């Protein structure tokens, strides 16, 4: 256990029961790793706040490909932001709807900008940006 510090935490028993249930459902074998992951999540979220932070993530879009010129608009936007987009995946969900997942990387501000432009495009039914860390600062 070199490099690890032991700490004590006082927590309401009802809350602890709920936490134990949650971590059991997620497959944690002990509370320590679950607490470490909670802390890591908060630290990663904090990095998003700085517009200069390097982040990686995904932009997920659902749209009707029959909407006039929507495919062309989305492709044009992607080319405008080619420096932030590493890869795309296109899935035909059914006869009308498509799912597009873009892997993005760069400054937090740039990643948010490309996501905002894509998600707000008329005809996009749903969109979501999910950001995580590049892992460089994580141990």
UniProtKB/Swiss-Prot annotation:
Any matching Pfam family: NikR_C
Look up the record and name the cofactor or cofactors this protein needs: Ni(2+)
Query: Which residues make up the binding site for Ni(2+)?
Result: 79, 90, 92, 98
Task: Report the co-factor binding details.
Answer: Binds 1 nickel ion per subunit.
Tell me a GO biological process for this protein: response to nickel cation
The answer to whether keyword Membrane applies is no
Per UniProt, the keywords (alphabetical) are:
DNA-binding, Metal-binding, Nickel, Transcription, Transcription regulation
Q: Which InterPro entries match?
A: Acetolactate_synth/TF_NikR_C (IPR027271), ACT-like_dom_sf (IPR045865), Arc_rbn_hlx_hlx (IPR013321), CopG (IPR002145), CopG/NikR_regulator (IPR050192), Ni_resp_reg_NikR (IPR022988), Ribbon_hlx_hlx (IPR010985), TF_NikR_Ni-bd_C (IPR014864)
Q: Name one GO molecular function term.
A: nickel cation binding
Which Cys pairs does UniProt list as disulfide-bonded? none
Highest taxon listed in the record's lineage = Bacteria
Can you tell me which family this protein belongs to?
Answer: Belongs to the transcriptional regulatory CopG/NikR family.
| Chain's role | Transcriptional regulator.
PANTHER family (UniProt xref): NICKEL-RESPONSIVE REGULATOR
What name does this protein carry?
Putative nickel-responsive regulator
């Amino acid at each position: 256990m070199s490099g690890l510090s032991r700490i004590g935490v006082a927590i309401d028993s009802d809350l602890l029961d709920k936490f134990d249930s949650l971590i059991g459902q997620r497959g944690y074998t002990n509370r320590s790793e679950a607490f470490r992951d909670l802390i890591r999540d908060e630290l990663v979220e904090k990095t998003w706040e700085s517009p200069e932070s390097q982040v990686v993530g995904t932009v997920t879009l659902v749209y009707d490909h029959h909407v006039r010129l929507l495919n062309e608009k989305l492709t044009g936007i992607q080319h405008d932001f080619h420096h932030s987009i590493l890869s795309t995946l296109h899935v035909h969900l059914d006869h009308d709807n498509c799912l597009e997942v873009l892997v993005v990387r760069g400054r937090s501000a740039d990643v948010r900008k490309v996501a905002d432009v894509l998600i707000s495009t008329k005809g996009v039914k749903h969109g979501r940006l999910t950001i995580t860390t590049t892992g460089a600062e994580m141990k």
